[in-house]
Amino acid sequence: MLEEKLERSVEQSAAALTAMADDFFDHPEVGLQEFHAFETLTGWLEKEGFTVERGIAGMDTAFRAVWKHGEGGPNIGLLCEYDALAGLGHACGHHMQGPAILGAAKALKDAAIDAPYTITVYGTPAEESISGKVVMLENGCTFEELDVALMMHGGPATQVDVKSLALNKLKIIYHGVCSHAALKPEKGRSALDGLIMACQGVEFLREHVPSDVRMHYTIVNCGGTAANVVPGYAEASMYVRSYNRTELDGVVARVRKVLQGAAMMTETEVEIIEEKSLDNKIPVLALNELVMEQAEKVHAPCIRPARQKTGSTDFGNVMRHVPGTCIRVAFVPEGAAAHSQEYLDAGKTEAAHNAVVYGAKILALTGAQLIEDPEKLEAIKKEFHENLAKELNSQS
């Protein structure tokens, strides 16, 4: 039976896959510096017979690996991340993704399913820092040759996301005029005053935005340490989020007016630099249901309904081009937060090793279902295009 064959393949690779995950955990690499993980993953895929392209989309640690069985048929995309957090190591579980994806890719390759199909593995670096998938898209890697894009991520429960928050990251700089705060205060124009008033304006704005909107900021440069100098420079970083891109664009426009108004009131100048823009996911319920069915088949731990409260991800931008989903597999206690000591402490546990194996099995079984059942795949693609059209129409 095909399902048993796929699971057996993953189990036979389990020791190598979990050892690889432990190795990545012990050698954490931040975004764009993931050279060890990159070489390990691409080398393994090459040995398995995949055609590997390194350094794609203008990113040294991005890759594409392709294996074809016959001509035509669906192209199953498997995407992985492998960057760590600066100062925290693999406290988000990215060390498990690559090994799980390789396990699924090898199982699907070795299965030699009767129908023609292609397996494409994408290595997508720097998710935590510069949202590498966005950079890849901007550099011409659209992922549109894929019929579906699948990911795995560790978490406190085995579940999928129904949605994600669209995000705009703003770098905000106020320029003022320095002056002696006691001798010539009238000559000064405080950049810090402008920034403080902007932050106060954002606080008042909270009352007048939809309930799902999140606005958070930090002052990264307060303009100096001498109280007797009117600050000529002040800088902040701000995230604005919403579950709907159209809604978010409207809120960001209002935030910009607040920032400009604060500059006007303090006779300072403001620079507003958009550093990052992430789209919300386009959910495909049929694909989510299919993935969760496979999770139940392999008896994955702590199976729960889809997450309703989520963060932001560059996978949302990919999901504007191709139907996709990410299965989260339990390896930390329920209630544990990502980017935490709990995630770090669990990184090399038996639960983490099991999550790699479960993730590989779930994605392998999902891929096989889509290869063997073209009607199921077409229904997923149809739902995706309908949901995408609704989203885009709401923006017009």
Predicted regions and their residues:
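Non-cysteine beta-strand/loop elements that form the S-adenosyl-L-methionine
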Residues: 77-79, 175, 326-332
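General beta-strand structural signal in soluble alpha/beta enzymes
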Residues: 53-56, 121-123, 150-152, 304, ...
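Histidine/acidic-residue-rich, glycine-tolerant segments that coordinate divalent metal ions
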Residues: 61-67, 83-91, 95-96, 102, ...
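Short strand->helix junction
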Residues: 27-31, 85, 181, 245, ...
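Acidic/His- and Gly-rich active-site-bordering loop/insert found
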Residues: 2-118
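General structural feature for long, well-ordered alpha-helical segments within catalytic domains
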Residues: 2, 13-20, 33, 37-44, ...
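Metal-dependent amide/peptide-bond hydrolase catalytic core
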Residues: 196-396
